[in-house]
Amino acid sequence: MKIAFFDSGIGGLSVLHHAMRVLPKEQFVFYADEDNVPYGVKTTDEVKGFVQQAFDFLVGCDVKAIVVACNTATSVAVREMRHRYDIPIIGMEPAAKKALDLDGEHRVLVAATPITVHGKKMQILIDRFDKDHLVDLLPLPRLVEFAEREEFRSEAVHAYLDQELGRFHLADYSALVLGCTHFNYFKDTMREIMPENMHFVDGNEGTVRELIRQLDARHELEDLPQTVDYYYSGRRVEDPAELARIARYLKRLDFVYDIR
């Protein structure tokens, strides 16, 4: 049986990319809801409806687990999906706790989509772990749009990030938490703007580690040739141009993977 990765668009490829490195004997399904991206500026009810449609499709594919490789979908819908479907469902959370644990003295900046930044789940997370009030939140909605059109290194991207990150005195911060899977594509540009003392933290490693833990507990880890099937909003991706597009995103992730 295969492992499904679900995202509003191509951001979730960053989580799949890490899983492909550490689970070379597994077979995967990647579902990008390209018809409805971006989720971060939609209403909560709209996102819940999109997620349920995707889950109905993926469960029909007889997958053994679903990784919600989307912070927005996790914050809005993952609890409800766990009640609805009887398979392991692993969500993404902004790794604010991890960032605080790494330092504990300097400030932490969490970048995410507006719906994640302003959501109840984020507030609960901050209330639980940010006892010293060291966390600041930064919505970056345009990064999702830039990523979806493969615009990673343009003057517009640099100007946008320079403006938004420039709202903060970054020398006071130890970490930038990438609270949206689309944001990993921009690590090189962000690195140019950030001071040396500031590093990246994302939830990809922890999410895949939790996936492995749950599958191991169920004795469902495989020893098969690695494959990936790609779907856009329920339609299998077979067009060579679209497969080449996905390959370009994965190549981009190879390039930024080791940027800290």
Features from the language model and the residues they span:
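Non-catalytic structural scaffold of enzyme domains
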Residues: 1-260
